[in-house]
Protein backbone atom coordinates (compact mmCIF):
# COMPACT_ATOMS: atom_id res chain seq x y z
CA UNK A 1 0.00 0.00 0.00
CA UNK A 2 1.37 3.42 -0.96
CA UNK A 3 1.91 5.52 2.13
CA UNK A 4 0.38 8.98 2.41
CA UNK A 5 3.27 11.38 3.00
CA UNK A 6 3.77 12.66 6.59
CA UNK A 7 0.32 11.53 7.75
CA UNK A 8 -0.11 9.93 11.17
CA UNK A 9 -2.80 7.33 11.85
CA UNK A 10 -3.65 7.77 15.54
CA UNK A 11 -5.16 4.65 17.14
CA UNK A 12 -7.39 5.13 20.18
CA UNK A 13 -9.40 2.40 21.92
CA UNK A 14 -11.62 4.15 24.49
CA UNK A 15 -13.91 2.54 27.05
CA UNK A 16 -16.36 4.89 28.77
CA UNK A 17 -13.55 7.35 29.36
CA UNK A 18 -14.21 10.91 30.64
CA UNK A 19 -10.74 11.86 29.38
CA UNK A 20 -11.35 10.89 25.73
CA UNK A 21 -12.50 14.27 24.42
CA UNK A 22 -9.83 16.13 26.39
CA UNK A 23 -7.20 13.78 24.99
CA UNK A 24 -8.33 14.46 21.41
CA UNK A 25 -8.47 18.21 21.97
CA UNK A 26 -5.04 18.35 23.58
CA UNK A 27 -3.51 16.21 20.84
CA UNK A 28 -4.82 18.41 18.03
CA UNK A 29 -4.03 21.69 19.82
CA UNK A 30 -0.40 20.70 20.34
CA UNK A 31 0.28 19.17 16.91
CA UNK A 32 2.41 21.31 14.60
CA UNK A 33 0.63 19.82 11.58
CA UNK A 34 -2.86 18.83 12.80
CA UNK A 35 -4.03 18.55 9.20
CA UNK A 36 -1.86 15.43 8.87
CA UNK A 37 -3.55 13.58 11.72
CA UNK A 38 -6.04 10.79 11.01
CA UNK A 39 -7.79 9.47 14.11
CA UNK A 40 -9.14 5.93 14.25
CA UNK A 41 -11.28 5.56 17.36
CA UNK A 42 -13.12 2.58 18.81
CA UNK A 43 -15.55 4.35 21.15
CA UNK A 44 -17.04 1.83 23.54
CA UNK A 45 -19.87 3.79 25.11
CA UNK A 46 -22.78 3.71 27.53
CA UNK A 47 -25.83 5.66 26.28
CA UNK A 48 -26.21 7.46 29.60
CA UNK A 49 -22.59 8.66 29.94
CA UNK A 50 -22.49 11.61 27.57
CA UNK A 51 -18.96 12.69 28.47
CA UNK A 52 -17.43 10.79 25.52
CA UNK A 53 -19.75 12.22 22.85
CA UNK A 54 -17.81 12.71 19.59
CA UNK A 55 -20.57 14.23 17.45
CA UNK A 56 -18.58 17.42 16.85
CA UNK A 57 -15.94 15.38 15.03
CA UNK A 58 -18.16 13.21 12.85
CA UNK A 59 -18.09 15.52 9.81
CA UNK A 60 -14.32 15.94 10.08
CA UNK A 61 -12.68 13.78 7.40
CA UNK A 62 -9.72 13.15 9.68
CA UNK A 63 -11.89 11.05 11.99
CA UNK A 64 -12.83 7.39 11.54
CA UNK A 65 -15.07 6.48 14.45
CA UNK A 66 -16.37 3.02 15.30
CA UNK A 67 -19.11 3.18 17.95
CA UNK A 68 -19.51 0.03 20.05
CA UNK A 69 -22.20 -0.32 22.73
CA UNK A 70 -20.49 -1.21 26.00
CA UNK A 71 -22.36 -4.51 26.24
CA UNK A 72 -20.78 -5.57 22.92
CA UNK A 73 -17.21 -4.76 23.98
CA UNK A 74 -14.83 -7.70 24.36
CA UNK A 75 -11.74 -6.16 25.94
CA UNK A 76 -8.99 -3.73 25.09
CA UNK A 77 -7.07 -5.97 22.67
CA UNK A 78 -10.25 -6.65 20.72
CA UNK A 79 -10.90 -2.90 20.60
CA UNK A 80 -7.35 -2.13 19.46
CA UNK A 81 -7.79 -4.68 16.68
CA UNK A 82 -11.00 -2.95 15.61
CA UNK A 83 -9.13 0.34 15.31
CA UNK A 84 -6.39 -1.21 13.21
CA UNK A 85 -8.95 -2.17 10.58
CA UNK A 86 -9.43 1.58 9.97
CA UNK A 87 -5.84 2.07 8.77
CA UNK A 88 -5.61 3.35 5.20
CA UNK A 89 -2.01 3.78 4.18
CA UNK A 90 -0.88 6.61 6.44
CA UNK A 91 2.91 7.01 6.63
CA UNK A 92 3.13 6.71 10.43
CA UNK A 93 0.96 5.39 13.21
CA UNK A 94 0.62 6.39 16.86
CA UNK A 95 -1.18 4.07 19.26
CA UNK A 96 -2.28 5.67 22.53
CA UNK A 97 -4.80 5.28 25.31
CA UNK A 98 -7.75 7.65 25.69
CA UNK A 99 -6.23 9.45 28.69
CA UNK A 100 -3.13 11.27 27.46
CA UNK A 101 -1.62 14.75 27.16
CA UNK A 102 0.80 16.15 24.57
CA UNK A 103 3.75 18.52 24.37
CA UNK A 104 3.85 21.25 21.70
CA UNK A 105 4.97 19.95 18.28
CA UNK A 106 4.83 16.36 19.50
CA UNK A 107 4.08 15.12 15.99
CA UNK A 108 7.12 16.55 14.21
CA UNK A 109 9.34 15.63 17.17
CA UNK A 110 8.33 11.97 16.96
CA UNK A 111 8.80 11.91 13.20
CA UNK A 112 12.26 13.44 13.62
CA UNK A 113 13.22 10.69 16.07
CA UNK A 114 12.16 8.05 13.56
CA UNK A 115 14.13 9.70 10.76
CA UNK A 116 17.21 10.16 12.95
CA UNK A 117 17.20 6.44 13.75
CA UNK A 118 16.70 5.55 10.08
CA UNK A 119 19.75 7.66 9.20
CA UNK A 120 21.71 5.39 11.55
CA UNK A 121 20.74 2.37 9.48
CA UNK A 122 17.65 1.25 11.40
CA UNK A 123 14.93 0.79 8.76
CA UNK A 124 11.96 0.13 11.06
CA UNK A 125 12.31 2.02 14.36
CA UNK A 126 9.50 1.77 16.90
CA UNK A 127 9.20 4.33 19.71
CA UNK A 128 7.39 3.09 22.78
CA UNK A 129 7.34 3.19 26.56
CA UNK A 130 5.44 3.66 29.77
CA UNK A 131 5.47 7.41 29.25
CA UNK A 132 5.58 9.86 32.13
CA UNK A 133 2.42 10.53 34.13
CA UNK A 134 0.01 13.45 34.39
CA UNK A 135 -2.74 14.27 36.88
CA UNK A 136 -6.09 15.32 35.35
CA UNK A 137 -6.89 17.25 38.53
CA UNK A 138 -3.62 19.19 38.41
CA UNK A 139 -2.71 19.63 34.77
CA UNK A 140 -0.26 20.74 33.49
CA UNK A 141 1.49 21.30 36.84
CA UNK A 142 1.19 17.62 37.77
CA UNK A 143 3.08 16.37 34.73
CA UNK A 144 6.29 14.43 35.36
CA UNK A 145 8.89 15.93 33.04
CA UNK A 146 11.57 13.24 33.11
CA UNK A 147 11.31 10.60 30.34
CA UNK A 148 10.77 7.02 31.46
CA UNK A 149 11.97 3.65 30.24
CA UNK A 150 10.62 0.15 30.89
CA UNK A 151 12.57 -2.37 32.95
CA UNK A 152 11.84 -6.02 33.72
CA UNK A 153 9.81 -6.73 36.83
CA UNK A 154 8.76 -10.38 36.76
CA UNK A 155 7.04 -13.28 35.07
CA UNK A 156 3.61 -13.47 36.72
CA UNK A 157 2.21 -16.92 37.61
CA UNK A 158 -0.03 -16.91 34.52
CA UNK A 159 3.03 -16.42 32.30
CA UNK A 160 2.94 -12.81 31.12
CA UNK A 161 5.91 -10.54 31.69
CA UNK A 162 5.40 -7.43 33.82
CA UNK A 163 7.48 -4.27 33.54
CA UNK A 164 8.12 -1.18 35.65
CA UNK A 165 8.79 2.41 34.58
CA UNK A 166 11.82 4.38 35.72
CA UNK A 167 13.57 7.59 34.70
CA UNK A 168 15.99 7.20 31.79
CA UNK A 169 19.50 7.61 33.26
CA UNK A 170 21.37 10.64 31.93
CA UNK A 171 18.47 11.67 29.72
CA UNK A 172 19.52 15.33 29.67
CA UNK A 173 22.68 14.42 27.76
CA UNK A 174 20.90 12.26 25.18
CA UNK A 175 20.09 13.36 21.63
CA UNK A 176 18.57 10.12 20.34
CA UNK A 177 16.17 7.46 21.71
CA UNK A 178 17.55 4.58 23.80
CA UNK A 179 17.13 0.85 23.01
CA UNK A 180 14.19 -1.01 24.55
CA UNK A 181 13.35 -4.67 25.11
CA UNK A 182 9.70 -4.00 25.66
CA UNK A 183 6.57 -2.47 24.14
CA UNK A 184 3.85 -0.36 25.71
CA UNK A 185 0.35 -0.41 24.25
CA UNK A 186 -0.42 3.06 25.56
CA UNK A 187 2.32 4.72 23.50
CA UNK A 188 3.73 3.34 20.27
CA UNK A 189 4.90 5.45 17.33
CA UNK A 190 6.30 3.82 14.22
CA UNK A 191 5.79 3.24 10.51
CA UNK A 192 2.19 3.04 9.36
CA UNK A 193 2.39 -0.52 8.08
CA UNK A 194 2.80 -1.68 11.67
CA UNK A 195 -1.00 -1.38 11.91
CA UNK A 196 -1.22 -4.15 9.30
CA UNK A 197 1.85 -6.25 10.06
CA UNK A 198 1.55 -6.55 13.86
CA UNK A 199 -2.13 -6.40 14.68
CA UNK A 200 -3.41 -7.00 18.18
CA UNK A 201 -4.78 -10.47 18.75
CA UNK A 202 -8.47 -9.98 19.70
CA UNK A 203 -8.31 -13.17 21.81
CA UNK A 204 -6.00 -11.43 24.25
CA UNK A 205 -7.82 -9.66 27.05
CA UNK A 206 -5.28 -7.52 28.93
CA UNK A 207 -2.12 -9.01 30.43
CA UNK A 208 0.20 -10.62 27.90
CA UNK A 209 -0.67 -8.05 25.27
CA UNK A 210 2.52 -6.03 25.61
CA UNK A 211 5.14 -8.80 25.77
CA UNK A 212 3.53 -10.62 22.84
CA UNK A 213 3.53 -7.46 20.71
CA UNK A 214 7.14 -6.71 21.69
CA UNK A 215 8.31 -10.09 20.44
CA UNK A 216 6.09 -10.08 17.36
CA UNK A 217 7.26 -6.59 16.39
CA UNK A 218 10.89 -7.62 16.83
CA UNK A 219 10.41 -10.68 14.63
CA UNK A 220 8.82 -8.44 11.98
CA UNK A 221 12.05 -6.45 11.85
CA UNK A 222 11.10 -3.54 14.10
CA UNK A 223 13.74 -2.21 16.50
CA UNK A 224 12.32 -0.93 19.78
CA UNK A 225 13.33 2.35 21.42
CA UNK A 226 12.26 4.64 24.26
CA UNK A 227 11.98 8.36 23.41
CA UNK A 228 14.74 10.32 25.14
CA UNK A 229 12.47 13.30 25.79
CA UNK A 230 8.93 13.57 27.16
CA UNK A 231 6.40 14.38 24.44
CA UNK A 232 3.32 12.50 25.67
CA UNK A 233 1.91 11.89 29.16
CA UNK A 234 -0.34 9.09 30.43
CA UNK A 235 -2.81 8.89 33.34
CA UNK A 236 -2.13 5.69 35.28
CA UNK A 237 -4.52 5.65 38.24
CA UNK A 238 -7.78 4.80 36.38
CA UNK A 239 -9.47 7.08 38.89
CA UNK A 240 -13.06 7.87 37.90
CA UNK A 241 -13.07 5.51 34.93
CA UNK A 242 -15.26 2.45 34.48
CA UNK A 243 -13.20 -0.46 33.18
CA UNK A 244 -14.48 -3.04 30.73
CA UNK A 245 -14.20 -5.77 33.35
CA UNK A 246 -16.44 -3.74 35.66
CA UNK A 247 -19.28 -4.24 33.17
CA UNK A 248 -18.49 -7.79 32.03
CA UNK A 249 -19.41 -10.71 34.28
CA UNK A 250 -17.50 -13.11 31.98
CA UNK A 251 -14.24 -11.18 32.05
CA UNK A 252 -12.57 -13.85 34.17
CA UNK A 253 -13.09 -16.49 31.48
CA UNK A 254 -11.79 -14.10 28.82
CA UNK A 255 -8.76 -13.37 30.98
CA UNK A 256 -7.97 -17.06 31.57
CA UNK A 257 -8.25 -17.80 27.85
CA UNK A 258 -5.97 -14.86 27.12
CA UNK A 259 -3.27 -16.14 29.48
CA UNK A 260 -3.48 -19.61 27.92
CA UNK A 261 -3.19 -18.11 24.43
CA UNK A 262 -0.08 -16.24 25.53
CA UNK A 263 1.55 -19.32 27.09
CA UNK A 264 0.89 -21.28 23.90
CA UNK A 265 2.41 -18.54 21.76
CA UNK A 266 5.67 -18.85 23.70
CA UNK A 267 5.48 -22.58 24.48
CA UNK A 268 5.55 -21.95 28.23
CA UNK A 269 4.89 -24.33 31.12
CA UNK A 270 4.87 -27.37 28.86
CA UNK A 271 2.20 -25.98 26.52
CA UNK A 272 2.54 -27.02 22.89
CA UNK A 273 3.46 -23.93 20.91
CA UNK A 274 0.48 -22.65 18.93
CA UNK A 275 -0.37 -19.45 17.10
CA UNK A 276 3.23 -18.51 16.35
CA UNK A 277 2.81 -19.03 12.61
CA UNK A 278 -0.58 -17.36 12.10
CA UNK A 279 -1.69 -13.80 11.52
CA UNK A 280 -1.11 -13.03 15.21
CA UNK A 281 2.15 -14.94 15.37
CA UNK A 282 5.78 -14.14 14.74
CA UNK A 283 7.27 -12.49 11.67
CA UNK A 284 9.92 -13.86 9.33
CA UNK A 285 12.68 -11.27 9.75
CA UNK A 286 13.81 -12.67 13.11
CA UNK A 287 12.97 -15.62 15.35
CA UNK A 288 11.76 -15.99 18.92
CA UNK A 289 15.27 -17.16 19.84
CA UNK A 290 16.66 -13.96 18.30
CA UNK A 291 14.44 -11.95 20.64
CA UNK A 292 15.48 -14.06 23.62
CA UNK A 293 19.13 -13.39 22.80
CA UNK A 294 18.43 -9.68 22.37
CA UNK A 295 16.34 -9.26 25.53
CA UNK A 296 17.79 -11.76 27.97
CA UNK A 297 14.43 -13.44 28.56
CA UNK A 298 14.00 -17.21 28.17
CA UNK A 299 10.29 -17.95 27.97
CA UNK A 300 10.33 -21.75 28.22
CA UNK A 301 12.07 -21.52 31.60
CA UNK A 302 10.58 -18.22 32.81
CA UNK A 303 14.19 -17.15 33.16
CA UNK A 304 16.22 -13.95 32.84
CA UNK A 305 19.84 -12.95 32.38
CA UNK A 306 21.70 -10.85 34.94
CA UNK A 307 22.35 -8.23 32.23
CA UNK A 308 18.60 -7.58 32.15
CA UNK A 309 18.18 -7.73 35.93
CA UNK A 310 20.91 -5.08 36.18
CA UNK A 311 18.87 -2.83 33.84
CA UNK A 312 21.56 -2.67 31.19
CA UNK A 313 20.41 -1.74 27.71
CA UNK A 314 19.94 -4.44 25.09
CA UNK A 315 21.27 -6.28 23.22
CA UNK A 316 22.24 -8.88 25.81
CA UNK A 317 25.13 -11.33 25.58
CA UNK A 318 23.95 -13.81 22.95
CA UNK A 319 24.79 -17.40 22.07
CA UNK A 320 27.85 -16.30 20.07
CA UNK A 321 29.29 -14.80 23.26
CA UNK A 322 29.34 -18.24 24.91
CA UNK A 323 31.00 -21.57 24.06
CA UNK A 324 27.67 -23.02 22.97
CA UNK A 325 23.91 -22.66 23.38
CA UNK A 326 23.89 -24.81 26.51
CA UNK A 327 26.30 -22.45 28.26
CA UNK A 328 24.19 -19.50 27.13
CA UNK A 329 21.08 -21.11 28.65
CA UNK A 330 22.96 -21.66 31.90
CA UNK A 331 23.49 -17.88 32.10
CA UNK A 332 19.77 -17.45 32.87
CA UNK A 333 18.16 -17.50 36.31
CA UNK A 334 14.59 -18.48 37.10
CA UNK A 335 13.36 -16.03 39.72
CA UNK A 336 9.82 -16.19 41.07
CA UNK A 337 8.42 -12.88 42.31
CA UNK A 338 4.86 -12.61 43.57
CA UNK A 339 2.58 -10.45 45.69
CA UNK A 340 0.07 -12.27 47.92
CA UNK A 341 -2.94 -10.08 48.69
CA UNK A 342 -4.47 -10.85 52.08
CA UNK A 343 -7.58 -8.88 52.98
CA UNK A 344 -7.68 -7.26 56.40
CA UNK A 345 -10.86 -9.22 57.16
CA UNK A 346 -8.88 -12.47 56.85
CA UNK A 347 -6.38 -11.43 59.52
CA UNK A 348 -8.47 -9.74 62.28
CA UNK A 349 -6.28 -10.45 65.33
CA UNK A 350 -4.31 -7.67 67.01
CA UNK A 351 -1.50 -9.70 68.56
CA UNK A 352 0.15 -11.68 65.78
CA UNK A 353 3.60 -13.02 66.58
CA UNK A 354 4.44 -13.97 62.99
CA UNK A 355 2.94 -15.39 59.79
CA UNK A 356 4.26 -18.41 57.98
CA UNK A 357 4.64 -17.42 54.31
CA UNK A 358 5.51 -20.35 52.07
CA UNK A 359 5.31 -21.48 48.46
CA UNK A 360 4.75 -25.11 47.54
CA UNK A 361 5.28 -27.17 44.40
CA UNK A 362 4.40 -30.67 43.25
CA UNK A 363 3.63 -33.18 46.01
CA UNK A 364 3.23 -30.23 48.42
CA UNK A 365 6.97 -29.85 48.85
CA UNK A 366 8.08 -26.49 50.18
CA UNK A 367 9.99 -24.52 47.56
CA UNK A 368 10.49 -21.40 49.64
CA UNK A 369 9.57 -20.08 53.06
CA UNK A 370 10.17 -16.67 54.57
CA UNK A 371 7.92 -15.73 57.47
CA UNK A 372 6.51 -12.26 58.05
CA UNK A 373 7.67 -10.85 61.38
CA UNK A 374 5.79 -8.34 63.50
CA UNK A 375 7.45 -5.34 61.81
CA UNK A 376 6.42 -6.48 58.34
CA UNK A 377 2.90 -7.29 59.54
CA UNK A 378 2.45 -3.87 61.13
CA UNK A 379 3.71 -2.18 57.98
CA UNK A 380 1.32 -4.14 55.76
CA UNK A 381 -1.61 -3.30 58.02
CA UNK A 382 -1.23 0.37 57.07
CA UNK A 383 -2.19 -0.25 53.44
CA UNK A 384 -5.03 2.14 52.46
CA UNK A 385 -6.57 -0.39 50.08
CA UNK A 386 -7.41 -2.79 52.92
CA UNK A 387 -5.04 -5.55 51.81
CA UNK A 388 -1.79 -6.85 53.24
CA UNK A 389 0.58 -7.07 50.27
CA UNK A 390 3.00 -9.89 51.02
CA UNK A 391 5.85 -9.67 48.48
CA UNK A 392 8.27 -12.56 48.09
CA UNK A 393 11.05 -13.20 45.57
CA UNK A 394 13.23 -16.30 45.29
CA UNK A 395 15.14 -18.42 42.75
CA UNK A 396 13.46 -21.65 41.72
CA UNK A 397 13.63 -23.99 38.76
CA UNK A 398 10.08 -25.16 39.50
CA UNK A 399 7.04 -22.92 39.25
CA UNK A 400 5.13 -22.97 42.57
CA UNK A 401 1.61 -24.42 42.56
CA UNK A 402 0.21 -22.59 45.58
CA UNK A 403 1.08 -20.29 48.46
CA UNK A 404 0.29 -20.45 52.17
CA UNK A 405 -0.07 -17.67 54.73
CA UNK A 406 -0.58 -19.13 58.22
CA UNK A 407 -0.77 -16.52 61.00
CA UNK A 408 0.23 -17.26 64.60
CA UNK A 409 -1.42 -15.18 67.35
CA UNK A 410 0.04 -14.82 70.85
CA UNK A 411 -3.39 -15.30 72.44
CA UNK A 412 -5.03 -17.80 70.06
CA UNK A 413 -2.09 -19.72 68.66
CA UNK A 414 -2.46 -20.94 65.10
CA UNK A 415 -5.19 -19.08 63.21
CA UNK A 416 -6.96 -19.97 59.97
CA UNK A 417 -4.62 -21.12 57.23
CA UNK A 418 -4.95 -18.96 54.09
CA UNK A 419 -4.02 -20.45 50.71
CA UNK A 420 -4.14 -19.52 47.05
CA UNK A 421 -3.35 -21.29 43.80
CA UNK A 422 -0.74 -20.00 41.37
Spans of model-derived segments:
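Catalytic cores of eukaryotic secretory-pathway lumenal/extracellular enzymes that build
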Residues: 1-289
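Terminal low-complexity segments of carbohydrate-biosynthetic enzymes
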Residues: 139-140, 162-175, 179-189, 241-422
Amino acid sequence: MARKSQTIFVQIAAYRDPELVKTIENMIENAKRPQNLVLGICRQYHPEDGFDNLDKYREDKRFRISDVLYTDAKGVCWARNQVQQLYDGEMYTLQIDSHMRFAPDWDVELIKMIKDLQKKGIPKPLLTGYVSSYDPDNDPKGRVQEPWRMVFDRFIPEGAVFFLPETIPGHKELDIPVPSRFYSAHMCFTLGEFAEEVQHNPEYYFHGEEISIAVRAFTWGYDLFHPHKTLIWHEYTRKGRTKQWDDDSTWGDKNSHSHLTNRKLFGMDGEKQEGHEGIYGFGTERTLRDYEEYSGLLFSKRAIQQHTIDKNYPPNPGISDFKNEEEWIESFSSIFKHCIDVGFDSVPEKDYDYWVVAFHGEDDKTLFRKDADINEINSMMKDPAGYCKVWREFPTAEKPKYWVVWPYSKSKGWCDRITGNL
